[in-house]
A protein has these predicted regions:
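Short amphipathic alpha-helical segments and their helix-coil junctions
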Residues: 14-30, 65-69, 87-101
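Alpha-helical rod/repeat scaffolding segments in eukaryotic adaptors/tethers
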Residues: 21-33, 54, 58, 99-106, ...
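Amphipathic protein-protein interaction modules
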Residues: 69-121
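Generic helix N-cap/helix-start motif at coil->alpha-helix transitions
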Residues: 1-5
């Protein structure tokens, strides 16, 4: 279910199809927020590693955010730069301090993570499914290793 919902959300974002995007991200937001964040974060991290094998500079992170916001604004004017920053930062392992409230909802994550994924896929001329499959495999392996 998560795989299909995320694939639909990313495909709608790539196509700039507002109606399909809203439907897909509403479905994605109805799923377990921790799992959605884990999977989409793993996809984002892999994409960033592939597209920037020597690491990301601050300017490159800013370029991703600006490019993503600029492209999405035309068909999704609700795009929130703060949510993009938090999604991208989370994928890179940068999280708000635990004493600070997280200023985004699970719906914000469900909407903004696919926007960033779609932007990176388009920029790198990549397909979503291989990244999703690899992320799901890594997560399943990590969970299996955590079992007693």
């Amino acid at each position: 279910m998560l795989a299909d919902c995320s694939a639909s959300a990313v495909a709608a974002a790539v196509a700039a199809n507002r109606e399909e995007f809203l439907l897909a991200t509403d479905r994605l937001a109805s799923l377990d927020a921790e799992q959605v964040g884990l999977v989409l974060g793993a996809v984002l991290r892999s994409l960033l590693e592939d597209l920037h094998p020597d690491g990301l500079t601050g300017d490159e992170v800013q370029d991703v955010i600006v490019r993503c916001r600029t492209q999405a604004t035309g068909w999704f004017p609700e795009v929130d730069v703060n949510a993009l920053v938090l999604v991208l930062g989370g994928a890179l392992g940068v999280h708000p301090h635990e004493d600070e409230p997280v200023p985004v909802t699970s719906l914000d994550v469900a909407r903004h993570a696919p926007l960033v994924v779609a932007d990176l896929l388009t920029a790198g001329d990549r397909s979503y499914r291989p990244y999703l499959d690899a992320a799901l495999t890594r997560i399943a392996e990590a969970e299996a290793n955590d079992l007693p």
